[in-house]
Amino acid sequence: MAELVLKQGETVIATARKPEVLDDLKAKYPPSQLLTVKLDVDNSQDIKDAFAKAKETFGRIDVVFNNAGWAVAGEIEGHPEKEARRMFDTNFWGAANVSKEAVQFFRDENKPSGGLLLNNSALNGVQAQSGLGYYAASKYGMFIFVMTDVAKLTEDPSHSIRRFNSSSCRGVGSSLEY
């Protein structure tokens, strides 16, 4: 997604738990167009720091594409609870906390134009398949989070949210590892 936006000539703040995985992208685009920032969505301070660094560097954020997530396949009875909880921490709570920070940023920093918040859930969140029960539950939780009370933010102009949505895409391969 970041490279697609960069190819259109737009400015991007690309985040990853291990920013060095973005070095190839960083080599292709100038610092005036691309900022890479360490962001582990399981760490609330990382979230705050990433938004602060974006403001310091570019002054505003117009779009947040919330895409963190990971999955481990396996039968429910064989899945270690600790691993399932860690997956929920990232897939639901991490995405929810980034959403919360984005809403606050759009309201406080981008007056009056606000911003666009897109949360990438997963097709498995609405059309689950065997072996991905915990993953599907975490992604469905994010989908419902967006579609319920949080979606009402777009109805209240004081929140400065132009759009808040959730996409449910198929899985994609990634070189970014958990």
Language model region names:
Residues 39-49, 81:
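The beta1-alpha1 cofactor-binding region of Rossmann-like NAD(H)/NADP(H)-dependent oxidoreductases
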Residues 75-76, 80-86:
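Substrate-binding pocket helix/loop in short-chain dehydrogenase/reductase
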Residues 122:
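Residue(s) in the substrate-gating loop at a strand-loop-helix junction
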Residues 155-178:
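SDR active-site lid
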